[in-house]
Each structure stands twice: as structure tokens, then as C-alpha cells.
């Protein structure tokens, strides 16, 4: 599960520099292989830190795949403080039952971890793909706005996951249009 791009690519390099110069946070998107062999997390994190010249504290597992407790214990040992994996691929909403970050509890040791789990509220493909919710544009917009309103009413944290391929023009997908609509709505709030 290798990236489809190189960090040395001019466009990617400019994107990283723009993110860093605008004080944006860069996190690790740990690989599918790291989900199978959590010892790879440290190697991937170290590689990313070397390339962006910043300490990496945030993570999201590829395919929202997380094997507890192995993944979390490795994340914690490797200096990750926040994980954004906690969501279901097949339904948007509140997997943790809340829109607030919570600390992970190791089920083996029953120890309260230093890692904060941030609930993933909405993932692009969850809304559109037939194998998941399979919503049309109007349904996806209404569903998303309802979730956003719930987060606003509780003072929680909204986490959106939009893949770069969903932002492409000239596709049959409504996801680019939906993303733009949601960002405009959020800017009003």
C-alpha cells in the first residue's frame, strides 16, 4: 500500500510547504501494512518526520483499520497523541457515541491512555458508495447537515474525511459539490 505520489514531486512538495507555512498540522496516515504489523508505525512516522522536518503527533489508520490493543500501544509508544480513525466506513455518525474526543482505554491493562480518539463524523465514500449508505446528493447533503447541526448543538468536534480523489472535476460523483457546499455552510456557523 504505497503512496501514489512522491514527496519529492513538485506539486506535493509545494502543498507540504504551503501547509507548514500556514501553520497547518500534518499527521501520519499509517499504511495498510502497519495495520497488520504495528511495529511499522514507528518507521513510517520517523520517515514522515524526516521529510516534513516536524514532529508528528496525529494519526489515522488506512481503511479505518485499527487492531486494538496492538495499534494503540504502538501509537502511544511512538509518540502519537491523537488518533482520527474512530469511525465506521458503512455509516456516518458517532461511532464513539459522542462528538467529543475521548481517551483510549487499554482493554487488556484497563489503563487510561494518553491517546485521544477523535470521532470521525463524515467520510465522503460512506455517503455515496452503494456498499455503504448509497445516498444521492440531496440525501447526503441533508444527512451531513443534520450531523453538523448535532455537533454544533453539543459543542463537539466535527471531523470530515474527504479523499483527494473526491475533489476531482469531471467525474460522475457528487462528492466535490457536496464538500464545497458543506464548507460554505461551516463558514457561516
Predicted regions located by residue number:
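Short, glycine-/Ser/Thr-/acidic-enriched flexible segments
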Residues: 31-33, 89, 123-125, 165-167
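Metal-dependent polysaccharide deacetylase catalytic core of the NodB/CE4 family, i.e.
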Residues: 1-66, 164
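Active-site-adjacent pocket scaffolds in enzyme catalytic domains
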Residues: 47-145, 149-151
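Histidine/acidic-residue-rich catalytic or RNA/ligand-binding cores of hydrolases
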Residues: 37-43, 68-74, 94-100, 170-180
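Short acidic (Asp/Glu) and glycine-rich catalytic loops that position anionic groups and cofactors
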Residues: 24-25, 123-128, 161
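C-terminal domain-boundary segment and adjacent tail
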Residues: 19-23, 141-189
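A general structural detector for well-ordered alpha-helical segments in enzyme core domains, enriched
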Residues: 11-15, 40-48, 71, 143, ...
Amino acid at each position: 500500500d504505497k503512496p501514489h505520489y512522491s514527496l519529492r514531486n513538485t506539486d506535493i512538495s509545494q502543498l507540504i510547504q504551503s501547509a507548514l507555512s500556514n501553520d497547518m498540522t500534518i499527521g501520519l496516515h499509517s499504511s495498510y501494512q502497519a495495520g497488520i504489523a504495528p511495529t511499522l508505525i514507528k518507521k513510517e512516522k520517523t520517515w514522515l518526520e524526516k521529510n516534513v522536518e516536524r514532529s508528528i503527533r496525529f494519526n489515522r489508520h488506512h481503511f479505518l483499520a485499527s487492531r486494538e490493543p496492538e495499534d494503540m500501544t504502538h501509537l502511544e509508544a511512538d509518540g502519537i497523541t491523537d488518533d482520527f480513525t474512530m469511525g465506521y466506513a458503512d455509516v456516518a455518525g458517532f461511532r464513539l457515541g459522542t462528538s467529543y474526543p475521548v481517551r483510549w482505554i487499554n482493554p487488556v491493562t484497563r489503563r487510561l491512555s494518553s491517546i485521544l480518539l477523535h470521532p470521525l463524523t463524515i467520510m465522503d465514500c460512506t455517503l455515496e458508495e452503494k456498499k455503504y449508505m448509497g445516498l444521492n446528493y440531496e440525501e447526503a447533503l441533508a444527512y451531513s447537515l443534520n450531523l453538523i447541526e448535532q455537533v454544533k448543538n453539543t459543542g463537539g468536534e466535527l471531523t470530515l474525511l474527504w479523499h483527494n480523489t473526491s475533489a476531482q472535476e469531471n467525474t460522475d460523483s457528487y462528492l466535490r459539490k457536496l464538500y464545497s457546499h458543506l464548507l460554505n455552510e461551516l463558514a457561516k456557523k
